[in-house]
Amino acid sequence: MNSVPVMLFSISILLAAMLTEGRGLTQTQKESIFSAEHKSDLKSYLEMLVCRRLRDVPESVIHISKVSKEILPDDLLSTYLLELLVCFDKDKLVQSKGIVFNTIKRLLTNT
């Protein structure tokens, strides 16, 4: 019952690893040095990309629930929250947990 969410999470981790494979520095290259301002800009840019990606997750949750009737909505919600936990601060997740649960439950009941 929990195998599909775990499989989806594993696939997303593997894809991220494959995309970054082979991008290490060679011996002749020097590591770039970022100032604190650049690091904060990079962090905000990455958070923006993650937010854009996570906006599509509820649609994926609905699609999975339509395809597989064995998966309970709570399993889908816990998978989505795990994805959020990986991407954001735990404090931000705790604040938005109720909103996320209500939104996904509403979307699942409308299907």
Curated annotation (Swiss-Prot):
Expressed in acinar cells of the lacrimal gland from where it is secreted into tears. Not detected in a range of other tissues tested including other exocrine glands, internal organs and sensory epithelia. This is Exocrine gland-secreted peptide 22. InterPro entries: Esp1/Esp22. Belongs to the exocrine gland-secreted peptide family. It comes from the Eukaryota. The keyword Signal applies. GO terms for cellular component: extracellular space. Keywords: Behavior, Pheromone, Secreted, Signal. It is found in: Secreted. GO terms for molecular function: pheromone activity. One of its GO terms (biological process) is negative regulation of male mating behavior.
